[in-house]
Amino acid sequence: MKTLKAVVAKYNQTSLILRILIGLAVGSVLALVAPGAGWVGELGSLFVGALKGIAPVLVFVIVASALAQGSSKLDRRFGTVIWLYMLTTFLAAAIAVITSFMFPVKVVLADAAQSDVIPQGLGEVLSTLLTNFVANPVSALMNGNYIGILFWACMFGIAMKNIGAESTKVFLANTADAVSQIVRWIINLAPFGIMGLVYTNVSGNGLAIFTQYGKLLALLVGTMLFMALIVSPFIMFIYLRCNPYPLVFRCLKESGLTAFFTRSSAANIPVNMSLCEKLDLDKDMYSVSIPLGATINMDGAAITITIMTLAAANTLGIQVSLPAAIVLSAMSALGACGASGVAGGSLLLIPMACSLFGISNDIAMQMVGVGFIIGVVQDSVETALNSAGDVEFAATAEYHQWLKEGKPLPAFLKG
């Protein structure tokens, strides 16, 4: 018993990032030497399932509790966060257009993929987003509809603030703390979940599947890395007037790494909230901005939609004009907001963007098929970019306000 306690203590004392890296290595080795050990992959499924299960409850109780206590301060910082989320998503789409023009890619179209219902136009995507605001609150919690969860949590919190007894508000605050503790327990087991996810990917997908579509994959990943390491840091520098890379690399390490394997911004919400707490951000702000970011901060999705659409146009010999490219950027940025919370969700919006150039749904669905083939890497990098950006710009808005108030930036940004 003492030995077990000692092992658990040593496990908890070890850096979470180091534990995740060890889990990554162990999962890779097990996939190579024992590809038939399906139980290892189940660890990944359980981890992602736990995160997806607790995330909607976490968002609801934290937002409702903050508003009920009367402490939620959705001031200029919140407007700054929304502006940064939307700006970077549009810039990501615009940069994807530029890189596609610089390095035009044609692909050998695969068979059309069978998928969920495809949005037929931008209006349908926006209509769905608005409808999600007033979706049944129980249904929103069950389905991970974070727009609906935020709306009803705000309504519930405001109502509770006006009519709730103090004891009820304390209970709500205690509930929020209890759910946050459960999240910390789940995140503490992340190395086992990452091990299972890596095992599933390595044992089920060989590198040979990427050979045929290597150029397309390289363009997608290269554009996402350019966005993550050049464009986003530059925007952060404009607001903070200091070296942004300590914050960038911390977000990529603690948020992006986990998101790379979960492949879901929604599932990574608890991880991001934990990171925001470490960054000393205002809980009243990040409890709203992080779930919102998981819905509207979709840099990677905008890049995927844009590049895949232009690859289809190149393959068919369609000449894309500059005005059409600008419209595509806007359509991809807005449409990407409908891809949140779904692994590979951005691929389902390719037909919508393809319709701008008169590309048939059959051809567009073949591009979706190509996307699923390279999705092991593309979707992982896309989600890492999206999720890390959620924290980066929530922190940027917060720290920008600190500078306005004469408050010093955190020590790690002063180095």
Residue spans for each PLM region:
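Hydrophobic transmembrane alpha-helical segments of multi-pass transport and channel proteins
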Residues: 50, 86-90, 94, 221-225, ...
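Juxtamembrane helix-boundary/capping and inter-helix hinge elements in multi-pass membrane proteins
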Residues: 67-76, 162-166, 205, 241-244, ...
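Transmembrane alpha-helical segments and their short flanking loops
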Residues: 307-415
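Helix-loop-helix junctions within the multi-pass membrane cores of secondary transporters/permeases
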Residues: 254-336, 393-394, 407-414
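Membrane-water interface of transmembrane alpha-helices in multipass transporters/channels
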Residues: 39-40, 75, 207-215, 242-250, ...
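Membrane-interface alpha-helices at helix entry/exit sites of multi-pass transporters
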Residues: 73-81, 181-188, 278-294, 322-323, ...
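Signature of multi-pass transmembrane helix bundles
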Residues: 7-33, 45-51, 76-247, 407-415
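Transmembrane helix boundary and interhelical junction motifs in multipass membrane proteins
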Residues: 58, 193, 264-272, 302-308, ...
